[in-house]
């Protein structure tokens, strides 16, 4: 039997040595970001996505092995564990297969079959199931015992039927065959609870789809409709194939067909096996759909967090609103709040002009060059006001910012701690401004589920969702690196090796002793021990340090190697260091510097651009100076937009009209896609052509593949 490491090696297509190394590193308490970045030689430079998959599968396989051992121990305690059964349990590849094998030996609640056994009818059931041509009624006469509760031949036969049906239901081979049959030929059939009622689920009022072809988003929508008691859902098989599968397994291949056993097999199918396997099938479909939804949420979240920051500018944040007005915050280039106010542009034309005058004064007073506008209530009116104002500021521009989660953050204890003197509403304006300046630093303060780029995220298992999204946030923060002297506690909390206590202690140490001047000083933070320092040091940046390496992704353990590399290749032109290393030969240089080749390549990359931010290499966000309305759109119009969400059936694109347009999956490109994420991610800047506009239903249909045709 293959080991867990061997199974993972086969599944992931990675060398066994690398898999064993990663497992050992994880068991020693090393984090995924640390392993991915600083132990590349040990795993052949697997990226964090592969390492996360490995971690998940490792946990599953370890749980599977633990369950195998539990099941074998339980069966052995009953004196029923054979070598064949133990081998079958060890060979079971999934938890479902293990449970199938355990099913006959599990302690059950009282069933019709167990009651019949208590009445002493098991020998009768075995005799009938032998199918040797004996008449079941004649065999049953010997089991009529009123004192045991068997008052007639009919009652004896009914009990025997229940035992046979239960035994067939517990047969793992039969259940597996039926499961495979449903997967191949089954259909998911959906009907309306009330066909006359008009609901959002009308699309599924008369829906049927092969199990093998039903889409994840369809499963999630159907599940929600069923939960809300708007839909009825069943799994069906064609003709008589389900009962026939059980009968084939139950009946012996002889000239004589036992009608009694056939009837018991059909009863087992209808009453016990099919309802159970149908539930399992629905559960498997849901698990698949939830996994897909969580995967898509994670795919969408990563580029959203990794949006390029708009650095070095004084920024105005506008949190639109009607009754409570438009909240305004001006922050400097570092995110420090300079000014706040509230204006009421939607109350009247006079109030709108008054708002423009107030904002114009703030623009001039603080030298504002960028405006971030939240995309929520009253966003359209606020944008129109901003565009009118910007006619007097030709060098300024604006961007609509996704404000999802801003209100949640502004009312949180974290926001109260950060801005105790500000009203809740003004805090959200600050958050919106900072989202333009540094999306990652601001979004880490918010529960990822509140960011709003998921599909049915509230229906997904929350533990799995939280784990997947938490991993994305952690990977993004560590990929970028964190300035230890300016980072919030929320941001530090996501750094490899740090926890709530050490993150809080770093902030406290900074406030008490002033800015950190070296990475080595981080060791003085209370409760931050050697292991935590090892895991976090490479991801913490100190721009103020006299040691240039402290502002790079080079780990302190490799400082000597970095200095040796500079001695070897010179320090004249750091920007060309990577190219010069390639010319010299990375393998030869690595040997001289005393580190692995992959590590040295990373060191050269970091030295060539100290303080580099991987987000700066991505396309910048689309900033605007004017505004479009839906009525301005006409079919054939070409526009540039930003991908806001990627879901199973397409992508939603912000084209600057307050209503994201949909590029259906069939309009993304000329080849067939299984999922839009094969081509696109959140934050991508794309060219689209308008296909149709439905103002009444607020729907815009777009195409990417037809852009060239229109050119």
How does the language model describe each region?
Residues 13, 308-309, 474-508, 625-663, ...:
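C-terminal accessory/binding modules appended to enzymatic or scaffolding proteins
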Residues 31-32, 43, 47-114, 119-147, ...:
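Accessory alpha-helical DNA-binding modules that contact the DNA backbone or grooves
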Residues 50-53, 60, 64-317, 321-421, ...:
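Duplex nucleic acid-engaging cores and interfaces of nucleic-acid transaction enzymes
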Residues 97, 399, 405, 410-480, ...:
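Long, charge-rich intrinsically disordered scaffolds of nucleic-acid metabolism proteins
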Residues 142-146, 151-153, 207-208, 234, ...:
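Low-complexity, acidic/Ser/Thr- and charged residue-rich accessory regions of DNA metabolism proteins
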Residues 180-187, 318-322, 376-380, 401-408, ...:
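A glycine-rich phosphate-binding loop feature that marks nucleotide/adenosyl-phosphate handling sites
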Residues 280-298, 450-483, 590-635:
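Long, charged amphipathic helices and adjacent flexible linkers at domain junctions
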């Amino acid at each position: 039997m293959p080991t867990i490491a061997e199974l993972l090696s086969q599944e992931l297509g990675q060398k066994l040595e690398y898999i064993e190394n990663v497992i050992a590193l994880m068991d020693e308490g090393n984090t995924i970001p640390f392993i991915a970045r600083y132990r590349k030689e040990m795993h052949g430079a697997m990226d964090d996505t592969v390492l996360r998959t490995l971690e998940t599968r490792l946990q599953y396989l370890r749980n599977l092995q633990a369950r195998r051992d539990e099941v074998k121990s339980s069966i052995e305690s009953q004196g029923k564990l054979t070598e064949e059964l133990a081998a079958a349990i060890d060979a079971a590849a999934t938890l479902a297969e293990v449970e199938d094998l355990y099913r006959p030996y599990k302690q059950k609640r009282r069933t019709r079959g167990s009651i019949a056994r208590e009445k002493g009818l098991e020998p009768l059931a075995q005799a009938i199931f032998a199918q040797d041509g004996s008449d079941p009624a004649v065999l049953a006469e010997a089991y009529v015992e009123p004192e045991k509760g068997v008052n007639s031949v009919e009652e004896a036969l009914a009990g025997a039927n229940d035992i046979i049906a239960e035994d067939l239901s517990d047969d793992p081979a039969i259940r597996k065959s039926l499961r495979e049959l449903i997967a191949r030929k089954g259909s998911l059939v959906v009907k309306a609870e009330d066909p006359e009622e008009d609901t959002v689920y009308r699309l599924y009022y008369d829906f049927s789809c092969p199990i093998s072809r039903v889409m994840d988003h369809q499963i999630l929508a159907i599940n929600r409709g069923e939960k809300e008691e708007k839909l009825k859902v069943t799994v069906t098989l064609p003709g008589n194939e389900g009962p026939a599968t059980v009968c084939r397994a139950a009946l012996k291949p002889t000239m004589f067909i036992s009608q009694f056993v056939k009837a018991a097999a059909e009863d087992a199918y209808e009453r016990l096996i099919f309802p159970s396997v149908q539930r399992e099938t629905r559960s498997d479909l849901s698990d698949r759909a939830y996994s897909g939804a969580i995967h898509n949420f994670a795919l969408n979240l990563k580029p959203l967090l990794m949006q390029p920051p708009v650095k070095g500018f004084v920024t105005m944040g506008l949190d639109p609103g009607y009754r409570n007005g438009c909240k305004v915050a001006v922050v400097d280039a570092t995110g420090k709040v300079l000014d706040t106010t509230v204006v009421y542009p939607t109350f009247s034309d006079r109030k709108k002009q008054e708002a423009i005058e107030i904002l114009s004064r703030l623009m001039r007073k603080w030298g504002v060059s960028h405006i971030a506008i939240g995309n929520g209530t009253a966003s359209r009116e606020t944008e129109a006001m901003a565009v009118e104002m910007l006619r007097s500021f030709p060098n300024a521009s604006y961007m609509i910012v996704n404000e999802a989660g801003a209100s949640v953050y502004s009312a949180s204890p974290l926001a109260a701690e950060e801005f105790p003197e500000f009203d809740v509403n003004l805090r959200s304006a600050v958050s919106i401004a900072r989202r333009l300046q540094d999306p990652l630093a601001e979004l880490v303060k918010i529960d990822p589920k509140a960011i709003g780029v998921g599909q049915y995220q509230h229906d997904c298992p929350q533990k799995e969702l939280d784990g997947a999204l938490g991993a994305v946030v952690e990977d993004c923060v560590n990929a970028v690196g964190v300035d230890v002297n300016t980072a919030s506690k929320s941001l530090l909390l996501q750094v490899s090796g740090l926890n709530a206590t050490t993150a809080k202690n770093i902030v406290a140490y900074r406030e008490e002793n002033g800015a950190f001047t070296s990475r080595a000083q981080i060791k003085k933070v209370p409760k931050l021990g050697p292991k935590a320092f090892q895991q976090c040091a490479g991801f913490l940046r100190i721009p103020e340090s006299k040691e240039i390496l402290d502002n790079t992704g080079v780990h302190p353990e490799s400082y000597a190697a970095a200095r040796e590399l500079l001695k070897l290749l010179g320090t004249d032109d750091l920007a060309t260091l990577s190219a010069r290393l390639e010319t010299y030969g990375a393998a030869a240089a690595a040997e001289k510097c005393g580190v692995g080749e992959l590590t040295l390549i990373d060191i050269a990359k970091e030295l060539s651009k100290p303080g580099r931010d991987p987000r700066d290499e991505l396309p910048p966000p689309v900033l605007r100076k004017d505004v479009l309305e839906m009525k301005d759109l006409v079919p054939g119009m070409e526009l540039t937009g930003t991908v806001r969400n990627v879901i199973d059936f397409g992508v939603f694109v912000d084209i600057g009209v307050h209503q994201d347009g949909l590029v259906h999956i069939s309009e993304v490109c000329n080849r067939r896609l299984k999922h839009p994420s094969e081509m696109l991610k959140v934050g991508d800047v794309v060219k689209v052509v308008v296909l149709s506009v439905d103002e009444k239903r607020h729907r815009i249909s777009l195409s990417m593949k037809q852009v060239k045709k229109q050119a």
